[in-house]
Amino acid sequence: MMVDQIKLLFYNKMMDRTAIKQLISRLIAQFGITYTTNILDQLKTLGFKQATNASVSLGIDDLLEAPSKAWLIQDAERQGSIFEQHHRFGSVHAVEKLRQLIETWYATSEYLKREMIPNFRIIDPLNPVHMMSFSGARGSTSQVHQLVGMRGLMSDPQGQIIDLPIRSNLREGLSLTEYIISCYGARKGVVDTAVRTSDAGYLTRRLVEVVQHIVVRKMDCGSTRGIPFKMTQDRFKRNLYQQRLIGRVLADNVYLEMRCIAMRNQDIGNELANRLITIQKQLVYVRSPLTRKSISWVCQLCYGWSLTHQNLVELGEAVGIIAGQSIGEPGTQLTLRTFHTGGVFTGDIAEHIRIPFNGIISFAEDSVHPIRTRHGHPAWICQDNLSVSVKNKNRIHNVIIPYQSLILVQNNQYVESKQVIAEVRINQSLPKERVKKHIYSNSEGEMHWSTIVRHSPQHRQSNVYPVLKTGHIWILSGSLCNVIETSSSFYKEQDRFNIQSVFTKPEFLPYSFGRNKGEKNQLTNLHKKGQELNHLKFDSSATIKTYKFPYLTSLFYCKIRKDKTENKVILSIKPIQRRNKYYRKTPYRDFVFQTPTNGILNRGDILAIHENPEYRIHISGVIKYGTLKIDSIVENERIPNDREKTTFGSRYKVLRGGNFFFLPGEIYIVHESSAYILVSNNSIVQAGTQITPTLTSQLGGLVQIKNIQKSFEIRILPGTIHHPKRIPSISKQNNMLIPPGQSVFDNLKFDHWIYLQWITSPRKKTFALARPVIEYFVRKGSYPPILNLLKEQNTLRVKFLDYMLYEDGEEIQIKNNMSIQLVQTCLLLDWEKKSPIKAAKTSILELRINKIIKTFLQISLLNSFDFYVKGSKFKRFFNNKKSFVADSIPKTLESQLSIKHQGTIRSVSNRKTSFLVLSPSDSFQNSLSTNFQYYDSKNRYGKKKELKWNTFFDTKKVSRSLKKNYLSSIKDSEKRSLNSKVGLTSVSSFDHTRQLQGMKILGLLGYLYSIANCFLYPKGIFRNEVFFHRDSSIDDLVGFDKLPNWYFLDENRKIYSFHLRNLIGKRFFYWTRNLSNFNEIPLVNLGQFICEGARLFENQISSQSGQIIALSPEFLIIRLAKLYLATKGATIHNHYGDLLREGDTLITLTYERFKSGDIIQGLPKVEQLLEARSVNAVSRNIEDNFKKCNRVIAKFIESPWSFFFSAKISTEQSRKDLVDQIQGVYQSQGVQISDKHIEIIVRQMTSKVLTLEDGIATVFLPGELIELPRAQRMNRALKQLIYYKPILLGITKASLNTTSFLSEASFQETTRVLARAAIRGRIDWLKGLKENVIIGGIVPTGTGSREVTCQMDLEKHKKGSNLKIKNTHSFSCEIKDLLFNHGKVSLTFKRSNIHRELKKPLSENDSD
């Protein structure tokens, strides 16, 4: 007894729940259940006594918070603000921001949870919360963490993680927002309690149904296979691996060096498990129900221990029912929460590598490649193991970073202690899938993008644009106003208006006929609160008139010179291509101006042509297209003249760049007799040979002569002649292009392109002619698709297009030593087809600043959109007695004001005066003539006076009249208040169709509108003279004239401001003497998009993102914008320049996510795995692995056997993956289940195969489910093999595809199953427990099992004869004597005889 006590272990440590379990297990193994029960009673009594003496109670003060919580949360919030800032800058998109935010808060919560346990142990080890939770008595670590740590991230009703974490804990109390977020989980918890019990019960029923017939029938089935257990060095996983090893049986011997430490078929106890883990052997093979020979029973050694008794399982044990209940019963402990993150987070913290001290890091830059992390940050990935060293003055630290890891710092960068320098990749590659996430606009505005897109070919009629390169999407701020159909806006483009202003007015329809009568409407005053205005609409009548107006003028800068020798105007254009955030400069290209003298071009006309000398040839030959793709529609080349357009030749638009080839060769047509031909057919000539008395060949080569009607065609084909050894294959390679390196015949190869042509001589000899080929490339994208104009607009487009001048197979003949161009690059004018624009006028404009002359090509669009409006006559112009405007406005202009402006008269009701506010417009058309008629204020009903006008409208007279009449009745104290409220703006322009002597169109050069007041300064240009409107400002009745400032940016990026002073002759020069130089603006330009934080000036950065819409010496105007990052593969759902409302779909991002990271817990995950849902990765992988293995194995083994080996390999791998995934779900909930229970279930799910059509025999139909052992036996017996593939059946489907129709009918679909069984004539062999219970027989388990009965009879026989069984051979002999000889012992027996006798008393026997 003392010796036994010495062998016992002595425990002297604090024991928690896990340690108590281990102690009880050791006590049962050492003393048995009876002695263990007595010991545990004493332990229970001791526990209650100590608890009473301690008087442990739980108070709110016992909930101790970790001191590190404050700075952890502060650090997470700081990182969150950095993420938000990067998102505003456009550095990361919404998915990357959400992913990083979730991972940051999850890591913060986990670190706080890890700090909680040491905090309790250090501050108060006897804390009641600490003793209760961490001893395992009540409460988990997660629950205590919510009490004293932070609740962390929660999910919404759809299961998506909310990016707003709950920072507080239950001890501190929750805010209102945090409480509402918590209610999501609380509601789901209440539902879980009511539902999960029924779900778990149904799961248990299905599990028991599929394995109810599995019983332990034999001691050893003879299986030599096993499953591997890979040992780990991770101390956190050692206990898990030890528990999984205990109770198993070894499938092979285990050796330590040359010594055997464990034998096959030896069961693994606690000591052996510890020893196997200690020696850290890589692989240990153990027997498993997955590798048993039979699918209908299991042996003792494959099953292992019965964990209840810690000994080998007894024969006749119904281990299938035990397995089903062991898996289903813990389902009540699981949650039903479908807690997923949309794929942005997997629930694991990545392993980081940190450095121990400050220093400079260095590594080989050639071994790393740049990459974008899942958070959108730049990093470098190493393809192999990377050696990294950190140096400072005193120490050097070397570390090896595993391959495929991310390097987060640059080479030779200074790093600080504990800084993360690398992130190690996950060891196992998780399956991924590509998903889409819609990004919605959170503001109204106008859409722009700065990336490369293309129109989706699948959505030709919609606005879907795939992104080809990562870039930004900009939403320029703006508010959309809904205007009713019968209203139009007071304001035009670029107008400024007050928020309280009336925005719309009733529409004056241009195509309506009849009389429109004035109506009075009560409106809110624009400028003074509390006053009302009477709104009166113009009345129109009389005749119909037509008015035309100029549409738009655009400029772009180019160098222009005139070639006097060829009488051509040459434009030197320098295209600028944008690449990411940089501009790529290209050399100047010369384009020959192709416009007529009148400068009028239609849509699609060629503006200029550039001929690249690389595509110019000087010899005759044939054109052959390669990968070049052209438009099927042939366009005629048109050279415009003054009166008409002459058509000659054809041109073919290049749709896709590629290569084409030119085959040199001469062609001559001789109309004389053959006697004049000095060369013979199929002869070889050299260059300079006389062909006829008048023709000399320019090339050398083979001569081909054909008789064509009354003439002869003579071809000179240069090349080399080759005679093949065998002729039969010549037809396959006749008249075709051969690329370099390709074998032609007889292993003949060329290092350049050739054109192979087979020729048969008159003597019936065939030879090959390898003709030389010149390859040309047309690179689509060498020019920008659209030329950048100086003014941003969407109407006019000047496009670069490449044209081929000859079609495929066309012969080109050179005469008189001329040269021919093959490819031309053209500038084409283009605008919308539905636009009223019918033509465009081009002209050349020169601008001189000091001594520098700049040349601009100006394009003015003309339209013929006619407004047919009744000639107007004001029935009532004003409410007051004086018509001050009528004195100054001619009748012709008066009618046009009613058309374009539809001027609105507002009169103040409590005064006897009126004031007029006309909305400014820069597109007003004024049809001027030399004589104008106007109304006199004294005779306003018809007396006419002649006013000779000099083709422009004097606004100064209007201003004076306005001041005189309108302000005469206004008090001085009220004059200042009306400043910037009253203004008359109009534009002096002309009709393009009117033939005025000396009139030329110049256009707008783009000056800065003053924003100091509400006046605009449009201008008109006539007869080489420029006139500007002079605005009228009402301030102390002092009028002044103001010309707008013009701004130019020179080559040194300096801004100059000047006024227009002098005009020079008839040449188109603008000249000024005085230029004032302003501060340098090094980074921004007009129209440029800038991000928040971008540097505007040397000492100033932008605090907002937006677009620069105005530059001034004193300020910048930035239109606010919201930018979004669109990565490659994303989809834009709107056109460029579209107006969006808040909530509209903006872009769709495409990204990868882990398939296994969607649902990480709960019964739904278990059911998804056990039912083999289509979303389950194992269901897809079993078929994918089968195909991959079959392709590889088929290279070494014949096709039929490759199917069988592939099915075996893929099935075994899928079984192991499915066991690990099911076990992972339960372990994530803290539930421990033995692997052998799950393995029994999984074996039944993978026990069948699906027959295929390939080589099918007449035994089974295609698509029929059969057992795998049965298929293997049939293949051994039949001459014609059965082809099959593995399949993963769910537990429900597996229960309905068994050998027992009684079991199937009692489970589901009773009527269908019984009907089909009756039609087929099925036989139920009553192998399972359920079938025997239904018919009232003895269940084949326990004492009803035949093996158990034989074992009991054998024990009785042994006691009677007192025989000792020394080995397995004598034991078998006694079985034979018992069955056959009834007491006579025989030393010879056959196993088949025993099986034959076992079949007699019962109707069936288990088969392998």
UniProtKB/Swiss-Prot annotation:
Location(s) in or outside the cell: Plastid, Chloroplast
GO cellular component term of the entry, any: DNA-directed RNA polymerase complex
Main localisation: plastid
Enzyme Commission number: 2.7.7.6
Keyword Transcription: yes
Family the UniProt entry places it in: Belongs to the RNA polymerase beta' chain family. RpoC2 subfamily.
Function: DNA-dependent RNA polymerase catalyzes the transcription of DNA into RNA using the four ribonucleoside triphosphates as substrates.
Name listed for the protein in its UniProt record: DNA-directed RNA polymerase subunit beta''
Gene: rpoC2
